[in-house]
Regions:
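SDR active-site strand-loop-helix element
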Residues: 18-22, 59-65, 71, 110-112
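Conserved catalytic-core motifs of eukaryotic protein kinase domains, centered on the activation segment
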Residues: 28-35, 70-74, 121
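NAD(P)-dependent short-chain dehydrogenase/reductase
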Residues: 98-151, 158
Length: 230
């Protein structure tokens, strides 16, 4: 697909809203294949922004909490802070945000957290925190936790439900997902460093878009699937 082909397809469809969620989001793969990832994570979203500006469509795109990777500041992180992401994926997403807004200032960019759901409807699903907790409970496995890792994780159904009002937000960047002030899962307990990806979503709440806290969201998900009493 070329940029011209993409612009022609969008011009023919005349959409009111374009929702862009695709990315090469595996941080390890992105480190190993930065050029391939750059095309998916920066160039193609930029083409969409130019096409949206040309046809007058509203563009909503997903960024990532990985833009905050490497920050030393404690507490919930606002959209306005200076950023210098510590990994390739975070740097690419930050560049994507800047270039999309330059091309189409009306674009809404959502810095999404790690998300989760439980297996259902025959759809593929990757490992996630609630699923790992359920497996550990059922099979008597041990999990490791650390006080050095902070991030919110979000029930994907709530993220989807909030996309409709998000499409009406003013153009700009928004932290999007469940907040979390508690320690999160860290696979290597002995590593002596702290990671903080916990985002301040107050800007989003100012427009009436709300998420459960990370803890509330997990209970919400488990209740939806009838496994809260495991």
């Amino acid at each position: 697909c070329t940029e011209l082909q993409l612009m022609q397809s969008i011009a023919e469809a005349q959409p009111d809203v374009i929702l862009h969620t695709a990315a090469i989001s595996d941080t390890g793969y992105t480190e190993q294949h930065p050029e391939e990832a750059y095309r998916a994570n920066v160039e193609l979203p930029l083409w969409l922004a130019r096409a949206a500006a040309q046809c007058g469509a509203r563009l909503v795109g997903f960024s990532s909490d990985q833009v905050y990777a490497g920050v030393q500041q404690p507490g919930s992180l606002p959209e306005t802070m200076e950023l210098s992401p510590a990994n390739v994926y975070g740097r690419q997403k930050l560049e994507m945000e800047q270039r999309m807004l330059d091309a189409c200032p009306d674009t809404v960019l959502l810095r999404a957290t790690w998300m989760y759901d439980l297996p259902s409807y025959g759809l593929p699903i990757r490992g996630n925190l609630p699923l790992n907790l359920i497996k550990a409970t059922v099979y008597g496995e041990k999990l490791r936790f650390s006080n050095c890792d902070y991030r919110g994780i979000t029930y994907v159904r709530q993220a989807v439900e909030n996309l409709v009002p998000a499409a009406d937000l003013p153009g700009g960047v928004y932290n999007y997902g469940s907040g979390n002030a508690e320690n999160m899962v860290c696979l290597i307990e002995a590593v002596d460093w702290q990671r903080n990806l916990a985002m301040d979503c107050g800007k989003l709440r100012g427009y009436g878009i709300r998420f459960d806290t990370t803890q509330e969201g997990i209970y919400h998900c488990l209740n939806d699937y009838g496994v809260a009493d495991l």
